[in-house]
């Protein structure tokens, strides 16, 4: 029974990882078709994008995962739902202002990361990409939190299905 439970969490998580790899690969390939430095632009933008998530959202999701798991284990589903709402609120409270900071300071941030190989046009494109990517930062934080919530429920199959659908949509959008 324990192996079955472990596999019921592990296999969908592995599927989510493969889908994420595929979408990232397609996005990188598409960025190269737009601009020869497209991969560098997306890489540098992701550095700034992930920084506030890593510093602020990951500690919240890690701490809340423990609480959510204990609520599920003790059968307190009402507290589990409250925990999801509280965690989402905390993540949004922190990541919405940082998304705005990234949007406002994207020109400065892109100038800090420019290399000798990037033209001023590429730096401008990096700035624009950081600004537009930042709009999704709060949603990304909540999505990764919901992944941990599904994991604490020990029901990752629903999340894996949602990730497969979202990944397919992203790939189609990139290829069209």
Cite the ranges covered by each PLM segment.
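Membrane-embedded alpha-helical bundles of multi-pass transporters/translocases
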Residues: 1-176
């Amino acid at each position: 029974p324990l192996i079955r439970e472990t596999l019921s969490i592990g296999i969908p998580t592995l599927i989510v990882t493969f889908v994420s790899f595929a979408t990232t690969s397609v996005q990188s390939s598409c960025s190269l078709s737009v601009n020869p430095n497209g991969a560098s632009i997306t890489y540098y933008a992701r550095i700034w994008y992930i920084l506030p998530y890593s510093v602020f959202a990951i500690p919240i999701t890690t701490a809340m995962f423990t609480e959510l798991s204990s609520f599920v284990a003790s059968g307190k589903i009402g507290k589990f739902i409250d925990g999801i709402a509280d965690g989402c609120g905390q993540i949004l409270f922190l990541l919405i202002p940082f998304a705005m900071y990234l949007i406002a300071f994207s020109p400065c941030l892109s100038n800090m990361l420019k290399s000798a190989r990037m033209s001023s046009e590429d730096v401008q494109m990096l700035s624009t990409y950081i600004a537009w990517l930042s709009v999704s930062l709060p949603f990304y934080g909540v999505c990764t939190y919901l992944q941990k919530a599904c994991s604490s429920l020990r029901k990752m199959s629903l999340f894996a299905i949602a990730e497969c659908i979202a990944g397919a949509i992203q790939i189609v959008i990139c290829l069209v």
